[in-house]
Amino acid sequence: MEWNGRKIILDNLREELSAYTVDIQDVVRSAILDGIELGSYIEECREYPWRLEQIRLLIKEDLKEEVGTDLSGAMLYKIRCLHREGHNIEGLKKLLASGMEDEYAEIALDWHSKGYELKGLKISWIPRHLLDIFEKGLMAKMDMREFNTGVAYDKEYLLALMRLQSDGKSCKLFVDGTWDLKVLQLIEAKAGNLRPNEWAELEKRLRKDMDLQQVSELINCCKQGMGLAWIGENDVYTAKHLGYIRKAFEKKLDWKKLVGAGKSLTEIEEAYNSMLTEKGRVLSGRLHKF
């Protein structure tokens, strides 16, 4: 075995490694007998002979390429046990990032053994209080990468995002975690059944400083089939203004006369009532003909 530019054999082992514990020397002795090169790991495992032993066994069992040797002895042992039990350990080296804490490495191993789709998922980024929810999502075959941002979401916030994704909606707008929870829950509850084109229009007009009533009216407009193309991307309408526009559409009035974010509410109310009165006159005139 090569170590520090010198050749270690059984005859000089104790002398060459006299600065190391007997435990380290015994592991090296076993490695020499197995024909395994452990020289590059001796110093880093000076205080951890059991880890050195696990590296030796990992190499002996031809698992080094799949797993790497950056993990703790405890994790290397668990991986060897998984392999011995017949689990597929392909891809573990990439999954178990260098320096990953044992807690996260253990979770990664558990999820891998359960067959969850983990490709592209950075498990060490998941806040501890969200690990159980992430597992539920993985179990349901959801794409949890969309929420793998490192943001410490409130649990209810993440659940609302997951329900949106389940409805086929992109959550990109909301994954920064800064939206009001009640607004997000309203969007998830009311907009989940919007068609793709309606959802795309709604996304363009949603702003995180909107209140519940404004967002609710925007969704109502979408559901009425009005679309939202008439709203400029930088325009902000009050909930009451949107409500008058929607009601005008429902009553088949010339609702586009009410469009314009700069119009005052008084102006909007007068225009709406005027159109309503005019429609009443027209209907009344038609009835008199009969």
Residue ranges and their predicted role:
Residues 1-290:
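General marker for long, soluble alpha-helical cores
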